[in-house]
């Protein structure tokens, strides 16, 4: 018996389809059995390689910039030998652009802004700084606005105009011996840095601004006993830093400072801390605690990543936003909390006792 081509053709096609389906099903079953067998035997299935840097950026992407240090200028009138944020540019953002960036930070969760330099009172004789301080307190309603300064450019009229909007003023003072300050480079002509410190402390008391002192411990002041003068000045906080090297700033071929001769060991730093352990307001910061525990914005509003011992900038928050820029900051939030980075930082909540 013979089948006509017309009748035979659909049957052949059906057989082909069934055969193909059998092959596909066999392949699927084989693959499932392979992975299942591997899992049952405790073997590890192949996984794509993990981009650790990407994972780190995802973690940092979710970070809140609670406390930010904005170094809006690099220019300074002092020449401290260990300075780790030197005058490599003279750039300062226009006021409105700086305000725009600060607003972005507030919208991302910033509670505290610290203005630093360089010397922040140098630009426009402190007016630029004053306007930023006022904007952050009045317009942004930030709980804490603070400044770090060498104190040489501060006038009483600045307190009269902007003191109400400032929570904390930190003055850098590494020694209470004028000869030592000369060696370090924290000096301006014949002016007494220590006398000026006392004057500013009195203005802080008069205009109700919390007074803080920052000291960098180095080879020239590590043996000094500062107990009596610190007790007399009675700051709300005495931040004591171990001298830190940053490549490209105070170390390396492209640096404007050579800070190697100022560096002290961990043991010598600890000995200084032990001698001053009776001072309750002392807040120590070793190199380990300091290096990655600050969110630092440079003059272009770029976050600076210090993990590699240098300052690697992100893109500006003005261009890419806070969320993207902060993912390249290298910020160690755990170390920030460990070093006491979050404290009572609004003068409204402080019991200022003079």
UniProtKB/Swiss-Prot annotation:
PROSITE patterns the record matches: RADICAL_SAM
The entry's cellular-component GO terms read: endoplasmic reticulum membrane; lipid droplet; mitochondrion
Location of the protein in the cell: Endoplasmic reticulum membrane
Query: What's an example GO BP annotation here?
Result: innate immune response
Keyword line: 4Fe-4S, Antiviral defense, Endoplasmic reticulum, Immunity, Innate immunity, Iron, Iron-sulfur, Membrane, Metal-binding, S-adenosyl-L-methionine
Cofactor: binding comment = Binds 1 [4Fe-4S] cluster. The cluster is coordinated with 3 cysteines and an exchangeable S-adenosyl-L-methionine.
Q: What is this protein called?
A: S-adenosylmethionine-dependent nucleotide dehydratase RSAD2
